[in-house]
C-alpha cells in the first residue's frame, strides 16, 4: 500500500479519535472542550442529527409491515439476522450488509455493527448501570485472568460526571453491588410490574426489582443536557433515531457539543488501516486511512491517538499496526491483544400471563423496558454458589397484549379495541468469564475489499456459563410462580458470543505489561500516547450493560492525558 503523507502540516492535529460512537463521541467532546484540535475518523457514511428516515413512521407506513423479505435477508443479512428480532424495515439502514463486510468464525460469533456517524449510539438499548467493587475485585478474588488496575473509588466521580451530562433516569436502591447514580425521575413500574416487585421481594428478600435505568431524558435540564436534546416523548422507537434528542447518542449530544467548540474536524467514510509507529520516539505519530468510497490511501498525524472504533474495530486496528518493534500488533508485548473476548450471554428467559388487574392500564410506551433485577448470586457468603462463580441479571416488563382470533367483522373490531390480559417477559443476561482462548484474529490469507485482513473469531461459552444459565432460568421460573402468573414458559436457547452486542475485553487493562495491553489510565503500556477507551479495555464483564462505564473511563482518560501534557510529560 502507498499512503500519501504529502501536506503533513495540513493533516496534523493535536488528537485523533478513531470512531464516532458512544466512547468516540465522548472522547472527541472532552478533548475539544479542553482546547485540543481533534480529527474524528468514522469508517461509515455521514449522518447528522435528525436524519432518521423512519423515526415518525407507523408500522403500516413501513414496507411489508416492517418485515424484511427472506430473499433480502439471505442475500445481505444472513449473519446480522441470526438475532431474529434485529433486522427490520425501520432499522435496516443502520445495519451493515454481511455480503459487503463479512467475517469468518470458528465458532458462531454474532458481530452486530453499524457503519455511520454515531455508530451504535443510535441503536443502543440505553441501559446504564455502574460497575462496583464486586466486579472490579472479582478476578483477583476468584483467582482467574488478571486483576483490574482500578477500583470503584477511581471511577466513581467519573460516573457522576458523565451521568449528569448523559441524563440517566432511574431509582435509587442503596445496593452496594449496583451503585446508585445521578438519576433523573424514573419511568415508574406499571401496576402489574409493581405487583411482580412486591411478590418477588416478599418471597426472596435478597432480590431487588427496580425500574430499568436508561439514558432517556424524563426531565430536560438545559444547563446539563447540552447538544440537541429534549425531553423523552415515551414513544419507544429509540432504535430508529430520535429527532427530539430524547435519548443520549453521539449525534444528539457529544458531537454537537464538540462541533460548537470549533475544534472538531469530522471525516466520514474514513477507514483506519493502522497506526503509524515511530521507532525513534517509541510513540504513535498518526494513522493510515483508506477512503471508503475512492479507496484513496492517506495519512494523518497527531500527538495522541484515542482508539474508539468499538472493541473489535480498535483491536483489529492495533493487530494490523505491525512494525519491527511490534511484529504481532501495536502494544502486543503481552500476547494478550485479541484474546479474552467477552460479552454477556443471553438467549435465556421466560414468558407468562397475568390475569389480575384487568381494570387497569398504563399511559405511553416507556422506553426502559420495564424493570431490572440486578445480580443476587455470589454477592456474599449467604448467596454463594458452589457450582459456578459470578452471576446474572434480568431485564423485562409487563404489558397488556391483545391476541385477536375473531374473524373480520364487528367481533374483530371490538376485540382489537379492547386490551388483552397482561403478558410478562424477561431476559436473563449472564456474565462471561475472560478466557484467554476466546479470541479474535486477523486472517493470514484473506483480505476485505480495502486490502485489510479479514477478521476471524473463535469464542464460546464454557462450563461455568452453562451452569449459570441453568440457575438463571430456574430462578426466573420461581419468581414468575411467586407472582401468581399463569402459563409459565422458560427457555434456554443456544447462543453465541456477540449476541448481546456487548463485546469487550480484547485489549484488557492490567497492572503488569506482561499480562495486559493497557494500564490503569487506558494507555497502551509500551506506547503511552495511544489510549483505548472503548470496550476493549474491560478486564471482566460484570452483568451490567457496559456503555456508561466506557464513557466514564473515556472522560477519566482524557482528563489524565490533559494533565500529563500540561505538565510537559513524555506522554
Where are each of the predicted segments found?
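N-terminal glycine-rich phosphate/pyrophosphate-binding loop and immediately adjacent elements
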Residues: 2-139, 144, 149-160, 313, ...
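FAD cofactor-binding and catalytic pocket of flavoenzymes
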Residues: 91-120, 124-125, 130, 143, ...
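Short, glycine/acidic-rich hinge or "gate" loops at secondary-structure transitions
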Residues: 49-51, 169-181, 486-495, 567-571
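A glycine-rich dinucleotide-binding beta-alpha-beta segment and adjacent secondary-structure elements
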Residues: 210-218, 232-238, 268, 273-280, ...
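Glycine-rich loop(s) and the adjacent beta-strand/alpha-helix scaffold that form part
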Residues: 33, 37, 42-63, 244, ...
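Aromatic-residue-lined binding/catalytic grooves and analogous aromatic/hydrophobic interfacial grooves
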Residues: 25, 35, 224, 229-230, ...
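A conserved FAD-binding loop/helix module that cradles the flavin
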Residues: 540-558
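Conserved redox-cofactor binding core of oxidoreductases
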Residues: 64-110, 115-116, 124-130, 135, ...
Amino acid at each position: 500500500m502507498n499512503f500519501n503523507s504529502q501536506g503533513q502540516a495540513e493533516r496534523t492535529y493535536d488528537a485523533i479519535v478513531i470512531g464516532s460512537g458512544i466512547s468516540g463521541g465522548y472522547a472527541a467532546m472532552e478533548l475539544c472542550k479542553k482546547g485540543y484540535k481533534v480529527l474524528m475518523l468514522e469508517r461509515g457514511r455521514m449522518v447528522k442529527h435528525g436524519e432518521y428516515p423512519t423515526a415518525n413512521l407507523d408500522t403500516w407506513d413501513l414496507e411489508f409491515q416492517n418485515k424484511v423479505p427472506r430473499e433480502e435477508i439471505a442475500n445481505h443479512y444472513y449473519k446480522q439476522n441470526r438475532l431474529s428480532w434485529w433486522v427490520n424495515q425501520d432499522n435496516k439502514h443502520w445495519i451493515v450488509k454481511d455480503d459487503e463486510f463479512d467475517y469468518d468464525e470458528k465458532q458462531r460469533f454474532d458481530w452486530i455493527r453499524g457503519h455511520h456517524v454515531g455508530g451504535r449510539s443510535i441503536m443502543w438499548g440505553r441501559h446504564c448501570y455502574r460497575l462496583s467493587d464486586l466486579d472490579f475485585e472479582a478476578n483477583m478474588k476468584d483467582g482467574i485472568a488478571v486483576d483490574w488496575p482500578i477500583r470503584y473509588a477511581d471511577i466513581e466521580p467519573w460516573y457522576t460526571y458523565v451521568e449528569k451530562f448523559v441524563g440517566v433516569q432511574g431509582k435509587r436502591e442503596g445496593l452496594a453491588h449496583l451503585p446508585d447514580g445521578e438519576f433523573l425521575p424514573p419511568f415508574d413500574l406499571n401496576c402489574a410490574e409493581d405487583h411482580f416487585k412486591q411478590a418477588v421481594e416478599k418471597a426472596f428478600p435478597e432480590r431487588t426489582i427496580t425500574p430499568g435505568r436508561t439514558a432517556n431524558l424524563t426531565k430536560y435540564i438545559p444547563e446539563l443536557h447540552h447538544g440537541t436534546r429534549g425531553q423523552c416523548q415515551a414513544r419507544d422507537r429509540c432504535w430508529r433515531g430520535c429527532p427530539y434528542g430524547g435519548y443520549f447518542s453521539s449525534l444528539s449530544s457529544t458531537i454537537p457539543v464538540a462541533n460548537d467548540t470549533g475544534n472538531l474536524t469530522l471525516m466520514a467514510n474514513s477507514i483506519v488501516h493502522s497506526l503509524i509507529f515511530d521507532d525513534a520516539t517509541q510513540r504513535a505519530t498518526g494513522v493510515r486511512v483508506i477512503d471508503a468510497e475512492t479507496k484513496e490511501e492517506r495519512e494523518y498525524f497527531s500527538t495522541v491517538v484515542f482508539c474508539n472504533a468499538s472493541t473489535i474495530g480498535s483491536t483489529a486496528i492495533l493487530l494490523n499496526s505491525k512494525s519491527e518493534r511490534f511484529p504481532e500488533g501495536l502494544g502486543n508485548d503481552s500476547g494478550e491483544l485479541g484474546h479474552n473476548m467477552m460479552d454477556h450471554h443471553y438467549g435465556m428467559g421466560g414468558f407468562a400471563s397475568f390475569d389480575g388487574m384487568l381494570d387497569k392500564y398504563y399511559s405511553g410506551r416507556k422506553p426502559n423496558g420495564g424493570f431490572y433485577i440486578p445480580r443476587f448470586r455470589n454477592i456474599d457468603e449467604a448467596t454463594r454458589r458452589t457450582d459456578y462463580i459470578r452471576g446474572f441479571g434480568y431485564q423485562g416488563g409487563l404489558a397488556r397484549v391483545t391476541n385477536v382470533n375473531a374473524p373480520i367483522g364487528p367481533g374483530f373490531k371490538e376485540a382489537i379495541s379492547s386490551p388483552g390480559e397482561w403478558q410478562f417477559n424477561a431476559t436473563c443476561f449472564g456474565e462471561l468469564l475472560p478466557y484467554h482462548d476466546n479470541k479474535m484474529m486477523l486472517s493470514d490469507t484473506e483480505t476485505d475489499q480495502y486490502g485489510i485482513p479479514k477478521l476471524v473469531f473463535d469464542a464460546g461459552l464454557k462450563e461455568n456459563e452453562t451452569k449459570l444459565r441453568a440457575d438463571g432460568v430456574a430462578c426466573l421460573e420461581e419468581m414468575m410462580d411467586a407472582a401468581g402468573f399463569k402459563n409459565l414458559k422458560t427457555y434456554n436457547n443456544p447462543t453465541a458470543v456477540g449476541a448481546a452486542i456487548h463485546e469487550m475485553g480484547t485489549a484488557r487493562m492490567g497492572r503488569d505489561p506482561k499480562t495486559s495491553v493497557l494500564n490503569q489510565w487506558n494507555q497502551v503500556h509500551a506506547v503511552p500516547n495511544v489510549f483505548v477507551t472503548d470496550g476493549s479495555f474491560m478486564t471482566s464483564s460484570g452483568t451490567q450493560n457496559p456503555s456508561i462505564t466506557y464513557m466514564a473511563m473515556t472522560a477519566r482518560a482524557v482528563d489524565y492525558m490533559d494533565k500529563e501534557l500540561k505538565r510537559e510529560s513524555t506522554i
